[in-house]
Amino acid sequence: VNDLHDIRDRFPGVTGEWARFDGPAGTQVVDAAIDAGAAWQRSGNNANSHGSFAAAVACDALVETVSTTMGELLGAGPGGMVFGPSTTSNMMALTRAIGRGLGPGDEIVCTTLDHDSNVSPWLLLARDTGATVRMAELDPTTGRLPVDAVTDLIGPATRWVAVTGSSNAVGTIPDTAAVTAAAHAVGARVVVDGVHLTPHHVVDVAAIGCDVFTTSSYKWYGPHAGVMWVEPDLLDSMDVYKVRPAPDSGPGRLQYGTPSWEALAGIDAAARFLLETGMDRIVAHEALRFARLLDGLHGIDGVRVVGPQDTVDRAPTLMFEVDGLPPVAVAERLATDRVAVWDGHNYAVEAMLPLGLDAEAGAVRAGISVYTTDDDVDRLLDALRDVAASG
C-alpha cells in the first residue's frame, strides 16, 4: 500500500504527543538505525580500521558495507563515499582542497536557493584565493531556480558550480542534470547539495552527472552524520589537506580522523530502511500529506504561503507567514499545542530577501516526513486557525 499507515511504529521518538513538522532540520530516528548503532557499540568491534585482528577487520567491512548501501541509495556506486560529522564540515574540507587549485580570474557559480553550507564555503574559498563567486538568482514569485539563471553565468572562466538538489526552505527542485551538462560543456565541475532531496525523492547521481553529491543521514531517519560522494578519479586527483599517515587515494583522503563506527552502522540501517520501504512509496505517501497541508493553508484567512503555491517539482516542505505576527511568535504559539515547526531563515540565508522575507526573521517552516499522518496535518491546521484568528 502507498499509505504506509504502520510506518510510524518504526519510530520510537514519534509518540503522538507532538505533531512533528520539524523534519527538514532533522528527523526522528528509525528503529533499525537506533538498534544498529547500539549493537555496534555492544559488539566489541569498536576499534579502528586496517588492523589484523577481528574487530579491526569488522571496521573495514562496515565501511565497505555502508559505502555499498549508500551507492545503491544515491545511484552512484560504492566508490568515493566520504563520511564526516556533517555536510557543512564535509563541504569545508572539500572547498579547502579545491582552493589550492584556484586563483584570480577563476569563477564559481552559487545560487540564492541554496542552504548556506553550499554557499559560505565557496565565499570563504573566493576570499582566500581571489576567485570570484557569481550568484544565480531564484525566481522571487515561484521560489524556483530557472536553469538559465544558472547557465547564463557559466562561461570559460567557470571552474565550479554549486547548486541545491532541493530547497530546504520551500522545497523546489532545480534541474541539476541540465545545470551539470552546461557546466561540463565548459570543463567545470558540479557540486549538488542533496541534503533536502534525499529523503523525499529518488536520487540518481549517475543521471544527474554531477561530480560531488552531499547528503546528511539525520535528515533521513539516521544518526547525525554527513555523507559526501566524490567522483573517484576527482577524489584521487585533488590536492587535499590531510595528515601524513592518511591514505593517498580513496575517501580516507578527505575523512579527518577515525569515523564514528556506530554512526556508520546507523547510516547503513537508515539507508536500507529507505531502500526496503521504497522511495516511490515514500514519495507517494508524503505527497498526499503535503497536498492536504498546502490546501489547508490556502483556506486560512491571514496565512500566506511563501513562494510556490502548488506541489509540482518540490519536496514536501513549505514556508508561511501569519498576518500581524512575527514567525517566532507563530512557532511559539503552535508549540503550546504540541505542534513542532521551525521559524527563521533556516540557513537558506540568500533566499530570504528574494522571497520577500526579513533576512533574520524569515518565515515559519513546516515539512512532511514519512511518519507524518493526516491527523498531524489537521492538528497543525486547526492550531494555526486559532493563531491566525487571534493574531
Model regions: which residues?
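Pyridoxal 5′-phosphate
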Residues: 1-391
